[in-house]
Amino acid sequence: MDDDIAALVVDNGSGMCKAGFAGDDAPRAVFPSIVGRPRHQGVMVGMGQKDSYVGDEAQSKRGILTLKYPIEHGIVTNWDDMEKIWHHTFYNELRVAPEEHPVLLTEAPLNPKANREKMTQIMFETFNTPAMYVAIQAVLSLYASGRTTGIVMDSGDGVTHTVPIYEGYALPHAILRLDLAGRDLTDYLMKILTERGYSFTTTAEREIVRDIKEKLCYVALDFEQEMATAASSSSLEKSYELPDGQVITIGNERFRCPEALFQPSFLGMESCGIHETTFNSIMKCDVDIRKDLYANTVLSGGTTMYPGIADRMQKEITALAPSTMKIKIIAPPERKYSVWIGGSILASLSTFQEMWISKQEYDESGPSIVHRKCF
């Protein structure tokens, strides 16, 4: 499809917003889902001060701003700020007029009904889009992997969900949510690096720790054994150069940090780990479809990018499942953006074109139309 009429695909995550054009194989814009407002009026006199900043600009000016994340644990909690993020997406990042393009938005599994209505209302009334659609994030990830049945373990910055999907439909009664994701792991790494004598506290330093996490952390296949290896040799140590030129060395922190996904007790949480949550989701499904879920367990989201995570999931779920069960963990290399990619695929299918909610339908039925047309 041509850019001039291509649908826009916007995946709003707790940490990052991914946006682009349907039919593309990757999002054109990826920026932090943050809105910043000046802490003190008039502190930037003569700089053409704006009353708010979004994304990377808010991030770079964070010293003089109060930063807010309008999406918490995957769910929009601040609609005024969310509107600013969408405005920034259309006009500054994609440089398009939203009234000229259909818009596909994504939502968290189990998103409250009122929220989807509010999204619909803002798209039609504030941005005057000709058509829109709301799709569940995990379902799009499954489509991106070329499947319509499977269970998706989607873990991003703010929340982790396990979502069983059968023939393209998410099974709401079996979806489980775990409030443990990338942001918690970054915080945990800050904490364990502090125990090593390196101090990271400010939001600027948190970004450095996030980078260390993304570059050096991995999931151990056998945690106890890895701890023993780390204690007896320096083979697992890596060094990292901080922006000021100081070099720090990290050892067992590399795998202790993401281990919290499998042992939330590390963070003082009583929840089950991601392997057990996935298993529990499968067990909430009809016995006849479990086989299909075990054999199609798809990882999605930035927090599934750790090396070793798929092998560890395979090992842990094999230990929980019936002994004869075939278990397959699918970890596509592009899984950081698979929700967006699934949206790009869906919105460009010829069969999908009659699925859009049109402005006319919205005017006739109001925001509740979204429950009838998007599921």
UniProtKB/Swiss-Prot annotation:
<dbReference type="GO" id="GO:0005524">
    <property type="term" value="F:ATP binding"/>
</dbReference>
<dbReference type="InterPro" id="IPR004001">
    <property type="entry name" value="Actin_CS"/>
</dbReference>
<keyword id="KW-0007">Acetylation</keyword>
<keyword id="KW-0067">ATP-binding</keyword>
<dbReference type="GO" id="GO:0005886">
    <property type="term" value="C:plasma membrane"/>
</dbReference>
<dbReference type="Pfam" id="PF00022">
    <property type="entry name" value="Actin"/>
</dbReference>
<comment type="similarity">
    <text>Belongs to the actin family.</text>
</comment>
<keyword id="KW-0558">Oxidation</keyword>
<keyword id="KW-0547">Nucleotide-binding</keyword>
<protein>
    <recommendedName>
        <fullName>Actin, cytoplasmic 1</fullName>
        <ecNumber>3.6.4.-</ecNumber>
    </recommendedName>
</protein>
<keyword id="KW-0206">Cytoskeleton</keyword>
<feature type="modified residue" description="Methionine (R)-sulfoxide">
    <location>
        <position position="44"/>
    </location>
</feature>
<dbReference type="GO" id="GO:0005925">
    <property type="term" value="C:focal adhesion"/>
</dbReference>
<dbReference type="InterPro" id="IPR020902">
    <property type="entry name" value="Actin/actin-like_CS"/>
</dbReference>
<keyword id="KW-0539">Nucleus</keyword>
<comment type="subunit">
    <text>Polymerization of globular actin (G-actin) leads to a structural filament (F-actin) in the form of a two-stranded helix. Each actin can bind to 4 others. Identified in a IGF2BP1-dependent mRNP granule complex containing untranslated mRNAs. Component of the BAF complex, which includes at least actin (ACTB), ARID1A, ARID1B/BAF250, SMARCA2, SMARCA4/BRG1, ACTL6A/BAF53, ACTL6B/BAF53B, SMARCE1/BAF57 SMARCC1/BAF155, SMARCC2/BAF170, SMARCB1/SNF5/INI1, and one or more of SMARCD1/BAF60A, SMARCD2/BAF60B, or SMARCD3/BAF60C. In muscle cells, the BAF complex also contains DPF3.</text>
</comment>
<dbReference type="GO" id="GO:0016787">
    <property type="term" value="F:hydrolase activity"/>
</dbReference>
<feature type="modified residue" description="Tele-methylhistidine">
    <location>
        <position position="73"/>
    </location>
</feature>
<dbReference type="InterPro" id="IPR004000">
    <property type="entry name" value="Actin"/>
</dbReference>
<dbReference type="GO" id="GO:0032991">
    <property type="term" value="C:protein-containing complex"/>
</dbReference>
<dbReference type="GO" id="GO:0097433">
    <property type="term" value="C:dense body"/>
</dbReference>
<feature type="modified residue" description="N6-methyllysine">
    <location>
        <position position="84"/>
    </location>
</feature>
<comment type="function">
    <text>Actin is a highly conserved protein that polymerizes to produce filaments that form cross-linked networks in the cytoplasm of cells. Actin exists in both monomeric (G-actin) and polymeric (F-actin) forms, both forms playing key functions, such as cell motility and contraction. In addition to their role in the cytoplasmic cytoskeleton, G- and F-actin also localize in the nucleus, and regulate gene transcription and motility and repair of damaged DNA.</text>
</comment>
<dbReference type="GO" id="GO:0015629">
    <property type="term" value="C:actin cytoskeleton"/>
</dbReference>
<feature type="modified residue" description="Methionine (R)-sulfoxide">
    <location>
        <position position="47"/>
    </location>
</feature>
<keyword id="KW-0832">Ubl conjugation</keyword>
<keyword id="KW-0378">Hydrolase</keyword>
<keyword id="KW-0488">Methylation</keyword>
<feature type="modified residue" description="N-acetylmethionine">
    <location>
        <position position="1"/>
    </location>
</feature>
<dbReference type="GO" id="GO:0005634">
    <property type="term" value="C:nucleus"/>
</dbReference>
<dbReference type="InterPro" id="IPR043129">
    <property type="entry name" value="ATPase_NBD"/>
</dbReference>
<feature type="modified residue" description="N-acetylaspartate; in Actin, cytoplasmic 1, N-terminally processed">
    <location>
        <position position="2"/>
    </location>
</feature>
<dbReference type="GO" id="GO:0005856">
    <property type="term" value="C:cytoskeleton"/>
</dbReference>
<keyword id="KW-0963">Cytoplasm</keyword>
